[in-house]
Every structure is written in C-alpha cells, then in structure tokens.
Amino acid sequence: MIDDPLVKSLLTNVVEDESNLPIVQALIDGVETDEAIAEKTEIKLNIVRKILYKLYDMGLATYKRSKDPETQWFTYSWKFEEQEVINHIKSDSEEYLKMLNKELEKEEDTMYFVCPQGHIRLDFETATEYDFICPECGEELEFFDNTNLIKQIKDDIKTVESNYKSFTKKVDA
C-alpha cells in the first residue's frame, strides 16, 4: 500500500519526512508497540512516538492502552487504519479536482492583463478600473494569453483523475 504514489504522498505529508515512512511500514506489517517499532526501524523512540501521534491525529492510526501487571506501566498497542487512508485520499482527490475544475473554468471564462514588469495580473474588469495601467509601476498592462495555463490545468486534471482511478482499482481489487 505504501508504494502507491497517492498513499506515499499523503503519508509523507503526515510524517514530515520520507525517512520516517518505515514507521508506517512497521505498523502496516503488524508491529504494535512504539518500542518494537523503534527497535525494528532503528528510529529514536521519541520520533516514533511523535509520528504515531501525528498519524493518530489524522485518524490514520489508533491505539489501545493496557497496563502491564508486573511493572504497572502502560503499554500502547498501535494499529494502522488502512480504510482511513483510503478515505483521506478519496476526499483529498475529490477536493483537489473540484479546485482544479473551478480554476479551469475561471481561466477559460476570463480575459487577463499583466504588467510587463511582472507586478500584477488582473482580470478585464479590474484592469479597466485601473485604465490598463499597473498600479505598482505605472506601465501599460498587456493582454495575457492563458492558453498554456489552461492546458497545464487540463493536464493536471487528467493526471489526478488517472492517479485516482489507478488507486481505486488497487483498493477495490
């Protein structure tokens, strides 16, 4: 599961650094206690705990607390919540696609003007309010051909849809 690009991206964002992914892999492999995970991954115990709590805060891991009858210390048994990872990815992908489609619609429906010095990009209505003069430097605004930007957004949409489709095929299999 961790090899999927969407899963890896989500988990890397949560654990802050790709070098902490072995902690997640240990959880997936069924290692339960923070001490055992630290031992298996050779990552400091305080870092393991920090990452486990981050996963917990995102709902990607849960724990059960039990008391050792001999030492009277609490032991935390952790479990990776695969379904929550799936839910996060579905939700994040849908949200990102909505944002991209909204951005695409805006770019396709709007005429833009830019400052030749790179100070500002304004839609037609706002540019008319400034008489097509840059409010920062006084240069005359130029028409901005956003064809390449529209193409890039469409490519991004295709990529997200393709990655999401590939992910759901793996999950549903």
From Swiss-Prot:
Transcription factor that plays a role in the activation of archaeal genes transcribed by RNA polymerase. Facilitates transcription initiation by enhancing TATA-box recognition by TATA-box-binding protein (Tbp), and transcription factor B (Tfb) and RNA polymerase recruitment. Not absolutely required for transcription in vitro, but particularly important in cases where Tbp or Tfb function is not optimal. It dynamically alters the nucleic acid-binding properties of RNA polymerases by stabilizing the initiation complex and destabilizing elongation complexes. The keyword Membrane does not apply. The winged helix domain is involved in binding to DNA in the preinitiation complex. The keyword DNA-binding applies. It holds the Pfam family TFIIE_alpha. InterPro entries: TF_E_archaea, TFE, TFIIE/TFIIEa_HTH, TFIIE_asu, TFIIEa/SarR/Rpc3_HTH_dom, WH-like_DNA-bd_sf, WH_DNA-bd_sf. It comes from Methanobrevibacter smithii (strain ATCC 35061 / DSM 861 / OCM 144 / PS). Keywords: DNA-binding, Transcription, Transcription regulation. SUPFAM superfamilies: Winged helix' DNA-binding domain. GO terms for molecular function: DNA binding. Monomer. Interaction with RNA polymerase subunits RpoF and RpoE is necessary for Tfe stimulatory transcription activity. Able to interact with Tbp and RNA polymerase in the absence of DNA promoter. Interacts both with the preinitiation and elongation complexes. Belongs to the TFE family. This is Transcription factor E. It comes from the Archaea. Residues 3-86 form the HTH TFE/IIEalpha-type domain. GO terms for biological process: regulation of DNA-templated transcription; transcription initiation at RNA polymerase II promoter.
